[in-house]
């Protein structure tokens, strides 16, 4: 797994192209952002991930692209990082997005977003 710097299709593609089988996408606030993260992980027509199999380690430099593409929906893990009060308010909708496999809570960032920075005893 790799935590990408931002919910951006270029960062996600780079991580997947080097062969990681899971991404942690930071600062996901709502279902639309979770859907964008999942779409960045999927090839067309299920998503928007770019296709360059001969230039990517993940597909054996093109030699395993069919097998790789077939396995990705089942084997790739997509984790959305929940870090704000807004994300907490939308957590059920984020979790319900098809293709989101895991939610990762950032307790320090959540605490800061509700005005209790570094006070882990508060909600």
Predicted regions and their residues:
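Expand to "…catalyze enediolate/carbanion chemistry for C-C bond making/breaking, isomerization
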Residues: 1-123
